[in-house]
Regions:
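Extended active-site neighborhood of metal-dependent phosphoesterases/phosphodiesterases
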Residues: 32-123, 141-161, 167, 173-179
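Short active-site segment of divalent metal-dependent hydrolases/proteases
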Residues: 25-26, 59, 135, 175
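N-terminal active-site segment of His-dependent metallophosphoesterases
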Residues: 1-31
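Conserved acidic residues
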Residues: 16, 125-127, 166
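Short acidic, glycine-rich surface-loop motifs adjacent to enzyme active sites
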Residues: 20-25, 118-140
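Residue-level marker for buried hydrophobic side chains located in beta-strands
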Residues: 18-20, 53, 129, 169
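Active-site glycine-centered loops adjacent to acidic/histidine catalytic or metal-binding residues
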Residues: 22-23, 56-57, 132, 171-172
């Protein structure tokens, strides 16, 4: 509806990509939701720009999520599309899986390695990190995750050390907050 209202149904020329921090559908195991609630409404947009989602608790290990998205396969070998990174111009986009069963040292060690490589990469000036569960939320305190706090701490330390800003995107609360 936003594109129809703001841009007469057209995709703006300066829209380079779409990032979605999880909860793409209500029930990830239901095919009709992917078609009717996700792909059909966004068909015009998704046909013109790349889409980089991370998995939320509503998609949790849905075979449809992994079937419909071809995400970078540069995460840990056993979970390569659960966490990943993609370079887009001078931005490194990092996708993390903050669902409970993937809150582990393997993912945090992988992030350490990616941030070390990013520090050395002179072509990368910014990091956009997206994950589903927020560390802090003014909208839903029960949805906060300490694990995400560990990720945010690593990203903030990276930015302080390198001067390369990291911007963090979260889902789960289904709302906007700046807190």
């Amino acid at each position: 509806h936003y594109l129809e209202h703001e841009f007469d149904g057209s995709v703006p020329e300066n829209l380079a990509l779409v990032m979605i921090p999880g909860d793409l559908v209500s029930e990830g195991g239901e095919y009709y939701q992917w078609k009717e609630h996700f792909f059909d409404p966004a068909q015009d947009l998704f046909s013109e720009v790349p889409v980089y989602p991370v998995i939320g608790n509503h998609e949790r290990n849905s075979t449809y999520y992994f079937k419909y998205f071809s995400l970078p396969k540069n995460g840990s070998p056993e979970h390569d599309e659960h966490w990943w990174y993609k370079d887009y111009g001078n931005v490194r986009i990092i996708g993390m899986d903050t669902n409970e069963e993937y809150q582990n040292r393997t993912q945090l060690s992988w992030l350490d390695d990616v941030l070390a490589k990013t520090k050395e990469n002179e072509e990368i000036d910014f990091v956009f990190a997206q994950m589903h569960h927020p560390h802090k939320s003014e909208l839903w305190l029960a949805g906060e995750e300490d694990y995400t706090g560990q990720i945010v701490k690593k990203l903030e330390a990276f930015s302080t050390e390198t001067g390369k800003p990291s911007i963090h995107f979260f889902g789960h609360t289904h709302g906007y907050s700046r807190g």
